[in-house]
Amino acid sequence: MGTVTEIAGPSGCGKTQFCIMLSVQATLPRHRGGLDGNVLFIDTESAFSAERLLEVAQSKCPDLHSTEEELCNMAQRVLVDNHQTCSSLLKKLETLEEEVITHKIRLIIVDSIASLVRKEFSSSAGSNLIHRTNFLSRQAALLKNIAELFSIPVIVTNQITTRFGRQAAEQDEELPTEFSEGYVTVALGNTWSHNVNTRLILQYLNDDKRQVMVAKSPVAPFTAFNYTIQKDGIIQDAEGAAVYAGTDPGVQQISVRSSLPFH
C-alpha cells in the first residue's frame, strides 16, 4: 500500500493481463483478498479489454460473478480512462486527488507509462531529453504523492529498450530494439527507475514459458518464478519461486523471444 509498482517487459509477456487481473482482485471484498473498492485504469495504448476483464472475473471467482448483474456491478467498478498525449495524461494525474475521493478509488493503474513518452520524445536532441526528464519526474511525483496520501497501490507498466555498450548504459541512451547488438533492459532509463518503489520484470524463458522477476523491492528479496497466462489471469507454476543474485534494476537484462537476437 502507498507505493508505486512498475511492471516491465517485452510485448506479449502479459503486462496488461497482469493489470486486468489486479483490477478484478481490487474489486473483491477484503475477506477474499481484495480492496473492496473501485479501480482507475488509465489506458494509453488502447489495450484494455472489457471482455477479458469479465472472463478473468468469472474464472477467478465464479461464486461472486455468476450472474449478469454481478458481472455488470464488478465492471462498473473499473473506471477506464484513455489518454493519447503526454499533456492529456499529465492533466489527468493533476486531478487524481479529487477523483480518488469522489469515486472511492483503491487502485490506480497506468498502462503504459512508456508509450506516450517514447512517441512524443523520440528524438535524442538535448531539449527533447530535458522535456522528457521533466515530464517523467512530474508524473512520478504526482503518482507517488497520491499513493502515499491515500495509502493505495499505484501500478504502472513500462516497455523495453536496447542498450549498446558501456557508454550507452552510463548515459541512459535508448536505441531501437531491432539492432543486432547490445542488450535488452527496461525503458526510460535510470532516473525513472529510481522513482518506482518496486519493479517487476516479465520476460520470456523460451517461446512457451514466461518468468516474473522481483528486480527491486523495499521488502522482498530478489526472486523469480515462472508463470502462465490462463483464463483466470497470471498463474504461478507449481515449482515455486527461486532466489537469484540481484543487480542494478536500471540495467537488469531481459530475455525476449528466442526468435529475436537477444538471450
Predicted segments with their positions:
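The Walker A/P-loop phosphate-binding site
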Residues: 1-66, 70, 258, 262
